[in-house]
């Protein structure tokens, strides 16, 4: 077990507010970490743009067989949110595998 994996498991066990779930289609990854999801909507000359400031970390072993690719739309449910209405959509802007973990940098879904 790598240092990163041990740290992930320790944080997951001790800081319950940082826990989240990730949903990719019908697949749900129940054990993930997220420090929070910051949402911002700003007015520009082109109209309103939404942005999200968030990073999500999960164990590489929990990642689906066909790894989560950049551009994939996922949903995140932070600990304590309603399971019916609390899911937040985000697009994977970057994927960074390190020491048994995968970090996903998220951005807004502008549809």
Whereabouts are the PLM-identified features?
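Short, compact, well-ordered microdomains
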Residues: 65-111
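N-terminal disorder-to-order initiation segments that are Gly/Lys/Arg-biased
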Residues: 1-55, 94-111
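Short alpha-helix capping/helix-loop boundary micro-motifs
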Residues: 54-64
